Structures are given as C-alpha cells and as structure tokens.
Amino acid sequence: MEKLNIAGGDPLNGTVHISGAKNSAVALIPATILADSTVTLEGLPHISDILTLRDLLREIGGNVHFEKGEMVVDPAPMISMPLPNGKVKQLRASYYLMGAMLGRFKKAVIGLPGGCHLGPRPIDQHIKGFEALGAEVTNEQGAIYLRAEELKGARIYLDVVSVGATINIMLAAVLAKGRTVIENAAKEPEIIDVATLLTSMGAKIKGAGTDVIRIEGVESLHGCRHSIIPDRIEAGTFMIAAASMGQEVLIDNVIPTHLESLIAKLREMGVRIEESSEQILMVGGQKELKPVDLKTLVYPGFPTDLQQPMTSLLTKANGTSVVTDTIYSARFKHIDELRRMGASMKVEGRSAIITGPAPLQGAKVKASDLRAGACLVVAGLMAEGVTEITGLEHLDRGYSQLEEKLTKLGATVWREKLTDQEIEQLQNS
C-alpha cells in the first residue's frame, strides 16, 4: 500500500495533456465483444479499470493486446462464461459486460458490480431495459443471470436519466431484431462516443446525445478503429487545480464544449479562462476569488464528478458558497477530511456549505472514493506543509499518470510505501 505526499504552495505552470475518457473507455472495451472481427481502440488512459477490463475480456477467451494507450481486441474466440465476483467487484462499470454479452451470446452471468461507494446506485433501469428487450433477469447468490431466447426491439422509457442504463441498453439492442427506442436517455458525451464506435462497427443508431435514441437492429457487427474522446473530468480537475494555484496552465487535448458548466462557474468566481478548439488556457494571479453556489445536474449541467474537487477550491473564495449534489447524496465524505485540513464547512442534507477564505494546512487524509481523492489532491496543492493521502486505489482507477502530470506543472508530489505501523493504523481507522 502507498500514500501520495504533496508539499503544498508551489505555483503551477506549463502544459498538461489530458488522457482518454475513463467513463467512455469502460463502455467502449465491453462493446468490442459485439464485433465478429478485430477492434482497435486508440487513446485509452492507463488506469487500473482498463487493465481489469482487459483481463476480463481475456478470461472469456478474447485475444487482447494493450500498450501505449492502444488496445487491439479480437473478439472472435470469445465464449459466454460466468464472470466471477473477484475482478468484477473492483469495477463499477463491469455492468456493461451484461449488455454486451447479452447482445452477442443471449446470456450472461456477472457478479454484482463494485467501484466507488456512493450510496444507492441501483441497476434497476438497466434490468428494466433488458427485460423489455426480452431477457429474463434473476439475481442468484450475488450474481446477475441474464437469459434470452431472442432479443426484440422495444420502446423503453428510463424513469431516471442514467448514463449506465442508456449505454447498456444500446449495447444489448444493436443486434436485437427490429427497432429499439430509448426515451429519457442520458445525453453525456461518453454516450455519443460509444454510439460512434458502434456505428463504425455497422450498427444503426440515431439520436445519441439527445434524450431519444433510436436503434435499428442489424444481423452482425464488424471490427473497426476508433479514437476515444478526451476525459472531461480529468480536464476539469486540472482546471480546478490551475484555478487554485496556477500562474498560466494550458490544458491540452480537451473539448471545451464538454465543460461549459465548469467554465461558467470558474469565470463567475473571477478566474480568467481562454478557449480554443482543443485547448483551454487558465490564467492565474487573481487577488481574490468570489464565492458561488452550484448544483450538480445531469449533462450538460455541472458534473457530480467535479463537485468534490470544486469544494476544495471554494475554501479560497471570499464568502459563503453552497454546493448541492442532486445526483449522489452520499458524495460528501470528503468534507470531514477537508475540515481536518482547516476548511470551514458543514453538510446539511444534500448540500455542503463552505465559508472562506480558510487557509488549508497539510494533514493525513484518506480518499473514500475516486473524486474525493481528486479533491484532496487539489487541497494538498493549496495547503501549507505536507499532505499525505491514502486510499490511492481509488485515485488509480481514474487518473492516468497523476504524479507525472502534476510534477511537470511544478508541483512537489511523490509516492511512498506505507510502513506496517501506518497500514495497521489505517485498518483500525
């Protein structure tokens, strides 16, 4: 086990290159199961979730080669077999294997998914979609069993706007007989990315990126080459870090339209931002940041994944800010850790109330989930003294080469192995 140390107070300068989108990659890789020949995915981030998916595809018989961000998958030899809880449990997005395997093999057995613990993140909308397409879904001994004689297109209305359910139903429907219509579909850029891959493989999909997606089932899908979109959440995290400690930071390989809600809020705080087609320039040196209120919403609203890093930045603002998370109410475990660093904030229901400016001090803190880890990294960059962050298994699931990228910008960041005594203290905490 390791900890990440950050000696705070260094100004950030330079260029950071953004990796491929994690939330896209974890759906694109299962989608390759649906093809009958080789699929090449370019620009994948080097994170633990991708390595787990690579191993899972190999377990069901796929030939998978992954290096330097390029994954080549030959799905032809794959067979339908139960996927055990072990690896599946490490991965929230393992549920995409359900839609892909159901689509190709008409059956699947998947251990219940793991990932970050963010309160109720049920998969009932996924199951509703699979059942509408003609599958029988049962939960037996902690695994989901899916079986279908054949899949037939259907009209499916999602009761809750869900990225996971929208993508999973798309995966199951592209090879189904007839037309599928997904109503109240999610509109995230990652959904458009998955639809682009499936279309390149021969699927017939219209309306991805709107709230109604129409799919005409086809007989088979073939291989192709696909380049992933940049990670808007990684880009947003670096933008927030640059707003907190930046002099001049260029965010490279980014689609600014994917981050309009964040750009608007940072400008409201007084941060200077310049955009071009694939880059965002953050210009620092603001004497004072203004407080803002923000509410997370489904895309194109403010992303729940950037709510936590944003709370760190708001400790610098001169006044009171209110952050409300309408997506995941349990996403405030980072508040106690920030208070340990000297932040003045409290949680009331689904909102965090932050009073600033509150200078942060380095402390020993623990990341409870992926984006809480990002929030503590931003706080560590701002704090006086050294911050020690544990729970790095969460950070490594979502941020590719984090220390290298921060070091290149001028931060003082390094990893250390935990001592036996520190491991014992962690396990008892």
From Swiss-Prot:
UDP-N-acetyl-alpha-D-glucosamine binds at R92, R121, P122, I123, D124, Q125, D305, I327. The active site is at C116 (proton donor). CDD domains: UdpNAET (cd01555). This is UDP-N-acetylglucosamine 1-carboxyvinyltransferase 2. HAMAP family: MurA. Its EC number is 2.5.1.7. Belongs to the EPSP synthase family. MurA subfamily. It is found in: Cytoplasm. It catalyses: phosphoenolpyruvate + UDP-N-acetyl-alpha-D-glucosamine = UDP-N-acetyl-3-O-(1-carboxyvinyl)-alpha-D-glucosamine + phosphate. Its main location: cytoplasm. It is an enzyme of class 2 (transferase). Disulfide bonds: none annotated. Pfam families: EPSP_synthase. GO terms for biological process: cell division; cell wall organization; peptidoglycan biosynthetic process; regulation of cell shape; UDP-N-acetylgalactosamine biosynthetic process. The keyword Lipid metabolism does not apply. The modification 2-(S-cysteinyl)pyruvic acid O-phosphothioketal is found at C116. It comes from Bacillus licheniformis (strain ATCC 14580 / DSM 13 / JCM 2505 / CCUG 7422 / NBRC 12200 / NCIMB 9375 / NCTC 10341 / NRRL NRS-1264 / Gibson 46). Keywords: Cell cycle, Cell division, Cell shape, Cell wall biogenesis/degradation, Cytoplasm, Peptidoglycan synthesis, Pyruvate, Transferase. Phosphoenolpyruvate binds at K22, N23.
